[in-house]
A protein has these predicted regions:
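Hydrophobic, aromatic-enriched alpha-helical segments typical of multi-pass transmembrane helices
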Residues: 11-221
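Short, charged juxtamembrane terminal tails flanking transmembrane helices
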Residues: 2-8, 219-227
């Protein structure tokens, strides 16, 4: 009887770990999408000044690669947050898993495509923004990055009652402060046209880092009695 119960419980305990691994792989996939795709852009494209979104523009070389990576990263992040973190937090944190998951889907979406890269001759920021792809990307990425900037601060407070998660309160608080500062700097960089690509990449890296920390902790605490 005891052996049968243990056999039934084993898959349940593995479930959170599986979603934690998926969450980690999702961040790797998303990072690969922009870090690798940068290597084959033309000489006019610069990671310092051009955004990640331009890598998936209709005129970008091999745009299918970042599009596929971003889609995989977005879907993986959604599954990790909704099917991994939400059950692990057992109702103590209700909104944040959905905010994380939907942000992942928003950042993973590449359609409709941006019509051209700003580094290409004849492409302008106004032309990008007035297109369906450019406007969609601006709205979705802006909202998603904002959610990923403020969510760590909320989690830093809400996770304290959970013994297996309270140790992350301080790192999440730091990540939230840095991400919010990065979001403000990104808005300024986009307005002035100075180092927008660099600031965006730094902000995205911070967001991916704290998501990876959550994924590692989910794996580490899988099967723990207090989640």
């Amino acid at each position: 009887m005891t052996a049968n119960v243990a056999a039934r419980e084993r898959p349940r305990r593995r479930g959170p770990a599986v979603w934690g691994v998926i969450g980690l792989l999702a961040q790797v996939a998303f990072a690969a999408g922009w870090m690798i795709a940068e290597t084959w852009q033309g000489p006019r494209y610069s990671p310092l000044t051009d955004t990640i979104s331009d890598l998936q523009a209709a005129t970008a070389p091999h745009a299918w690669f970042p599009i596929a990576c971003f889609a995989a990263g977005g879907l993986g992040t959604f599954g990790f947050a909704v099917f991994g973190l939400r059950p692990a937090w057992r109702g103590a944190v209700r909104i944040a898993p959905w905010a994380i998951g939907l942000s992942g889907l928003a950042l993973g979406n590449s359609f409709p495509q941006i019509p051209c890269q700003l580094s290409a001759s004849g492409c302008t920021a106004t032309g990008q923004l007035l297109s369906a792809g450019g406007l969609t990307d601006a709205i979705l990425s802006g909202a998603a990055l904002w959610l990923l900037a403020i969510t760590p601060l909320q989690l830093a407070r809400l996770l304290i009652p959970l013994p297996q998660w309270r140790a992350l309160a301080r790192p999440l608080r730091v990540a939230g402060v840095v991400a919010l500062a990065g979001y403000g700097l990104l808005a300024l960089a986009l307005l002035t046209g100075v180092w927008a690509g660099l600031v965006e990449r730094a902000l995205v890296a911070v967001c991916q880092l704290w998501l990876a920390v959550l994924a590692v902790n989910l794996i580490r605490t899988s099967g723990a009695g207090d989640g």
